[in-house]
Amino acid sequence: MAVDSFKYVSSLISRYYRLSSARPERPVPWTPLQKPLDQARFSLVTSGGLYHRGHEPPFDMERECAEPTWGDPTFRTIPTDIDQAEVGVSHHHINASGALADVNVLLPVRRFQELAEEGTVGSLAPHAYSFMGYQGFPADLAGWRQIYGPQVAERLLAEAVDCVLLTTA
């Protein structure tokens, strides 16, 4: 099945990438869900720069200020039962007020808990993951591809996750 990588991207960004010389290194992998939604375990991943205040450090904003073309490639683990008061956002490129008022703006944990209670989805994994979406200009994705992406993938497998909802900031 061919996947249109630009379907959900704003037309301006889509036009920029279509006109750029950058091309995908390989086709977008498409993996059909292997079980019905009401039996699937979900996790959530966001590029919103969320962190669990008081439990993990924020993303490295100081280095980004000193090196504006750099972005912190690490990730943070967010418990899906996080209390709103423990939600932190460290991301220079978004307005954090919405997520600070309601985590579901960037990470719809409460909605997925409701969907699990209703039986629409099987369950929500105990952890979600957050990256800081900005990775410099031009973007350096080596850290994501070689270190942090595989680490999150291992954690998702360990939590028996069948499907991930990705949210962008």
In which residue ranges do the predicted regions lie?
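Metallocofactor- and cofactor-centric catalytic cores in central/energy metabolism, strongly enriched
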Residues: 1-169
